[in-house]
């Protein structure tokens, strides 16, 4: 491993040894090798690179005395500054932990501090024409312009020739002895408050966890700022790549105007021709999320959908030699570009070509940059240091001397030292309230108002469109609905209310989903708003994350709860953290529908329909809803959609599979598990706020409180009916919301009887019941309590499932045991 001290000493020694150029060039001139960069642009890239390197050193210095809390360095990856230069500052960028130079250059671009390219010269004619090309067979010295017999005939003042060849901005100084000397101005010195210093302040604030840090406000160290179009990400193992795919797809759909004609399209946060850039390193390239994202990108391109995403992989050589190149090059549907990431001129040239191709074609590409990992977790070849390569380019091209670049390095180093000392004195987050303020704001009054406004629109201006969408017969006129039918109708009403709502998932369009819940939606709203995806849950959630970030309201469906478990990091690490990592500047509203919970009726479920929800309830800020009845499902879904729009909430709507098509409660044909769909005029009155339970009174309702959810509601009501025949009055509390739990309702209804039976269809260990009992203990409940829960087992197939799951009989027996105390 190259230590920070060794790396710094080596770079300083190499800069000092570079010497001075043989011939000085003006910074406004292009590189002599015909590259697209000017000297000023190359110098700006060097500034971004050295700022990033010095931030690495500053981070080590701060951590040395316990004030720096983040030490993943960008050293060796600074070539990505050239990628930033090849893009526009309005192109959304999702970076990774080693993207320091990219961030610094993007900040300079946004501040107008990155020099513009020289204007294209007009075609040369007449007196402006270049020298005539020598005729074949004649040497250049023998060629002469038209009208001259030979070069000796030209009447040109040698002084004019010398002056004309001087660099722009240079001059001739004549001393007392009459000797003339060409003088080229020194390099402009970095200002203490320039864009690179400002970017460094951002990063240093993140390193010391300052509450003034512009992205996460001291909550985490990320690269992110809304005004720079840099979206903060955890970038853990490439987990941000699926979001980039979703963002690219959403931007292209918005650009193509796929919203319905009667809906007002909201202004997209990025330009219509923006491209998404997503950076990752070779360490992330083999992780599941990255593989899923690249596969999904290629699949969409294969099907004809356009996704303008430029993936940038910085290959530090940690994988087997040639492996990353082979895998990226072989990706179908993704155009491959490659460059030496230590050479800013080559990187800029190829990155500009790749970015322009993606921008024009609206198709995906990957830019594979060779890099070197220095300092942390690396033992790369210091001779390939990108800073040293850029310095050599500046010196050999005649723009600077090694001494000047070393002085620049030192001056910037002292600037950053002063900034580091200043941010040390800035306030830190000092209270739980400050920390969680932007995690998941809850504004129930605004959510309720949004539901009321949707109702007013559906009953008023939108009544005609609603009638047409439902074929002239809205759901409130079709008679009692099942759970599945109620959800289908509520989805349709949600799509009518908000033109940006999109429903997607595996087979949700063509087949209406696994259980027919989305049947008919594509016919009503079109393939742009209801569409099929690959079955991979990570990819589906990534599409939702990107769509929400772009201003849409995504409603993805995951086929089964088991599949969601394999993709939960997209919820935990990406969706739920967006506001937390951006102080609310970015948000990704989303309502994830997932059929789940094990069926005691015979389907079983460890292979498809898991009965575990613990991993979802553990995610801070995530809303978890479990509707049991049709007359709860529709208003709860409306609440989730409204909360997503108003607060940017991320909601998981778990739909009990076993109850989808159930019609009866107590006896066959009683139709008591169906319900009328509420007309729009009743939506506001029947609004179900997040975190509010529903209570059913059976008999006197004074002897026992049964707290449950999902399948447990139907079973508990049947058990309560049996107990009522024995003279026991019960109140059944349907939690409806598992995160946040309806604690106030739990305490009130438990205290009313003094006996609580918690019926938890999830597993005994880590199940919902643990949270309910903890809430009772925390609030000082002193009555009796007992729990009936599923066994700590996977759910077997068929009738054997009844041996491990909760049943009405088990609930009845548990109640009798509790009452006998």
Annotated model-derived regions:
Residues 299-311, 529-532, 576-595:
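A glycine-rich helix N-cap at a beta->alpha junction
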Residues 226-425, 618-754:
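Glycine-rich ThDP/TPP pyrophosphate-binding loop and its adjacent helix/strand module
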Residues 54-57, 61-140, 147, 151-162, ...:
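Cofactor-binding active-site loop characterized by glycine-rich and histidine/acidic residues
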Residues 82-89, 245-256, 295-304, 329-331, ...:
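Alpha-helix C-terminal capping segments
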Residues 69-77, 97-98, 221-242, 339-344, ...:
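Active-site nucleophile and cofactor-binding loops and adjacent substrate-binding regions
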Residues 83, 104-109, 288-292, 320-324, ...:
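Short acidic, glycine/serine/threonine-rich loops at helix termini
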Residues 61-66, 219-234, 260, 272-277, ...:
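Glycine/charged-rich beta-loop-alpha catalytic/anionic-binding loops adjacent to active sites
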Residues 1-87, 94-97, 119-137, 146-151, ...:
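Conserved acidic/glycine
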């Amino acid at each position: 491993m190259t230590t920070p001290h060794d790396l710094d000493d080596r770079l300083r020694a190499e800069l000092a040894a570079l010497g001075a150029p043989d011939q000085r060039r003006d910074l406004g001139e292009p590189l002599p090798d015909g590259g697209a960069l000017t000297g000023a642009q190359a110098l700006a890239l060097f500034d971004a690179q050295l700022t990033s390197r010095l931030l690495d050193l500053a981070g080590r210095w701060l951590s040395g005395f316990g004030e720096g809390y983040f030490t993943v360095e960008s050293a060796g990856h600074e070539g990505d500054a050239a990628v930033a230069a090849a893009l526009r500052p309005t192109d959304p960028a999702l970076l990774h932990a080693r993207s320091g130079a990219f961030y610094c250059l993007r900040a300079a671009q946004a501040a107008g501090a990155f020099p513009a390219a020289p204007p294209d010269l007009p075609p040369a004619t007449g007196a402006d024409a270049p020298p005539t090309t020598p005729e074949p067979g004649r040497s250049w010295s023998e060629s002469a312009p038209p009208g001259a017999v030979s070069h000796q005939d030209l009447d040109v003042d040698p002084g004019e020739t010398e002056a004309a060849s001087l660099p722009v901005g240079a001059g001739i100084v004549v001393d007392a002895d009459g000797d003339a000397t060409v003088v080229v101005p020194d390099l402009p010195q970095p200002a203490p408050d320039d864009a690179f210093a400002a970017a460094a302040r951002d990063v240093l604030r993140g390193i010391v966890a300052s509450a003034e840090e512009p992205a996460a406000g001291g909550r985490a160290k990320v690269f992110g700022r809304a005004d720079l179009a840099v979206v903060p990400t955890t970038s853990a193992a490439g987990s941000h790549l699926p979001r980039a795919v979703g963002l690219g797809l959403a931007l292209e759909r918005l650009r193509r105007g796929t919203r319905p004609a009667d809906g007002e399209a909201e202004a997209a946060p990025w330009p219509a021709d923006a491209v998404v850039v997503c950076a990752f390193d070779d360490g992330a390239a083999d992780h599941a999320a990255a593989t899923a994202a690249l596969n999904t990108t290629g699949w969409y391109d294969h099907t004809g959908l356009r996704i303008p995403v430029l993936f940038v992989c910085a290959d530090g050589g940690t994988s087997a030699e040639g492996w990353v190149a082979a895998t990226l090059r072989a990706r179908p549907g993704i155009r491959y570009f490659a460059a030496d990431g230590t050479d800013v001129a080559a990187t800029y040239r190829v990155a500009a070509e790749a970015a322009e191709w993606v921008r024009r074609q609206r198709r995906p590409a990957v830019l594979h940059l060779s890099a070197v990992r220095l300092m942390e977790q690396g033992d790369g070849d210091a001779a390939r240091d990108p800073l040293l390569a850029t310095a050599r380019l500046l010196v050999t091209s005649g723009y600077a001397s090694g001494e000047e670049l070393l002085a620049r390095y030192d001056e910037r180093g002292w600037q950053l030292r002063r900034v580091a000392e200043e941010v040390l004195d800035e306030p830190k987050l000092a209270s739980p309230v400050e920390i969680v303020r932007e995690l998941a704001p809850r504004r129930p009054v605004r959510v309720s108002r949004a539901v009321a406004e949707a109702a007013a629109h559906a009953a008023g201006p939108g009544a005609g469109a609603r009638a047409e969408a439902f074929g002239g017969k809205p759901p409130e006129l079709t008679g009692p609905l099942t759970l599945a039918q109620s959800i289908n109708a509520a989805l349709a009403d949600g799509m009518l209310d908000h033109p940006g709502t999109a429903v997607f998932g595996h087979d949700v369009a063509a087949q209406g989903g696994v259980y027919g819940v989305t049947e008919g939606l594509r016919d009503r709203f079109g393939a742009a708003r209801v569409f099929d995806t690959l079955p991979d849950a990570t990819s589906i959630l990534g599409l939702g994350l990107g769509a929400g970030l772009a201003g849409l309201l995504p409603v993805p469906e995951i086929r089964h709860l088991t599949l969601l478990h394999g993709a939960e990091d997209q919820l935990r690490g990406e969706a739920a953290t967006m506001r937390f990592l951006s102080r609310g500047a970015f948000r990704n509203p989303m309502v994830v529908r997932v059929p789940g919970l094990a069926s005691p009726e015979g389907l079983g479920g460890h292979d498809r329909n898991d009965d575990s929800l613990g991993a979802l309830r553990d995610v801070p800020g995530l809303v978890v809803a479990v509707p049991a009845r049709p007359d709860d499902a529709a208003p709860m879904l409306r609440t989730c959609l409204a909360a997503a729009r108003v607060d940017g909430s991320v909601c998981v709507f778990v739909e009990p599979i076993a109850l989808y098509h159930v019609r009866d409660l107590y006896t066959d044909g009683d139709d008591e598990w169906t319900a009328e769909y509420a007309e729009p005029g009743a939506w506001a009155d029947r609004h179900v706020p997040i975190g509010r339970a529903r209570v059913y009174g059976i008999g006197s309702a004074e002897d026992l409180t049964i707290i449950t959810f999902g399948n447990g509601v139907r079973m508990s009501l049947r058990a309560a009916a049996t107990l009522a025949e024995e003279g026991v009055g019960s109140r059944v509390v349907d939690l409806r919301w598992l995160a946040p739990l309806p604690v106030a309702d739990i305490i009130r209804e438990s205290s009313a009887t003094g006996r609580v039976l918690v019926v938890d269809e999830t597993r005994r260990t880590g199940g919902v019941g643990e949270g309910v009992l903890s809430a009772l203990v925390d609030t000082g409940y002193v009555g009796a309590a007992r729990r009936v829960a599923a066994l700590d087992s996977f759910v077997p197939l068929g009738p054997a499932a009844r041996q491990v799951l909760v049943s009405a009989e088990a609930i009845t027996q548990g109640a009798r045991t509790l009452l006998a105390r």
